[in-house]
């Protein structure tokens, strides 16, 4: 019971810290002018909309948040960077779904290259925090809640102990792999932190690349003409290639080196199909 209360205290403290960051904003715009595409508005009638900082839940909220933070970033770059990093680590550390929107926001705010570096770094650090929190507070509770799933994953890890790093890469490369579950169960599976750390850093590069570049592309699109520009089409083609390449490579390697009896032919784990969330 003590471990549960310790985790609750940490979550409450982190939540309060995020609240303070968002409540005491530096001087800047509290509203932005957006174009309403409804029938009652024209392109010459921008509507002023008051926005508040919150985690985006759809693409429209993502675009609005990106516009607001871009205004702040022009004069308060450090604040925006600290706010973004804090929000990202909050989600990753406590296994809260929704990292894809923050990856896209990273691309929109910091550009494709810097956004990718930031996203990969924060994903790795946040997932490692999740690993440490699980090891400190949640091991027995996770085993109690998911006994069959943990046992099956434990068997698969032991079968691939000699190629553990590549096995973890296999699980990370496939987009439907539940990363939150791998993060919280890794201490139970006796996966060393160095192997866990680098499997996250390398294994999620394709996923982060796709999200970050998608965010960068979306932030530059203001009309249909922008979508069909050669530059945008080339970026979308690059994203598609990156999405396909890891799966092809890891499948070829897995046939000879990995034991994947607990996985379906498409690479997804049967034992976790009911809880596939990022």
UniProtKB/Swiss-Prot annotation:
Gene Ontology annotations for the cellular component aspect, listed alphabetically: membrane
Signal peptide stretch: 1-23
InterPro entries per UniProt: TM41A/B, VTT_dom
Listed transmembrane segments: 78-98, 101-121, 164-184, 191-211, 230-250
Keywords for this protein: Membrane, Signal, Transmembrane, Transmembrane helix
Compartment annotation: Membrane
Entry annotated with the keyword Membrane: yes
Protein's membrane topology: Multi-pass membrane protein
PANTHER family documented for this protein: PTHR43220, TRANSMEMBRANE PROTEIN 41A
Record family assignment: Belongs to the TMEM41 family.
Designated name of the protein: Transmembrane protein 41A-B
Species of origin: Danio rerio (Zebrafish)
